[in-house]
From Swiss-Prot:
Any one GO BP annotation for this protein: translation
Keywords: Ribonucleoprotein, Ribosomal protein
Stretches with biased composition (Low complexity): 111-121
GO molecular function: structural constituent of ribosome
Protein name in the entry: Small ribosomal subunit protein bS16
Family in the record: Belongs to the bacterial ribosomal protein bS16 family.
UniProt-annotated stretches for the region Disordered: 85-121
One Gene Ontology cellular component: small ribosomal subunit
NCBIfam families in the record: S16
PANTHER family the UniProt entry points to: 30S RIBOSOMAL PROTEIN S16, SMALL RIBOSOMAL SUBUNIT PROTEIN BS16M
Compositional bias segments (type: Basic and acidic residues): 85-110
HAMAP family with a match to the protein in the record: Ribosomal_bS16 (MF_00385)
Amino acid sequence: MSLKIRLARGGAKKRPYYRIVVADARSPRDGRFIEKIGTFNPLLAKDAAERVTLDTEKAKAWLEKGAQPTDRVARFLDAAGLLKREARNNPKKAEPGKKAQERAAERAAKAAEASEAASAE
């Protein structure tokens, strides 16, 4: 049985509220779970203390038992100091896209032509 620490959605339409639960990976998102270990309210301000509540002792115990957190829950656990999340490296994100590179090359070519024309006169 593969265990996941994940979010189970609750709340009304357009008013999400999540429980942080330990559940079997095969069970539905909002379905049966083994234990509730916290809550997440995305409608609160990012610096609000009640935005994420987490029972750290229960979370640590489930991590030791082999439960795998989802990406979002891993962020919460990292913020709580229970899990070290490795930084993702995406070197292509910093460089401009294909069209922007083409435009920059065109601008550089026009600037070079203009400087050649100015120096020739």
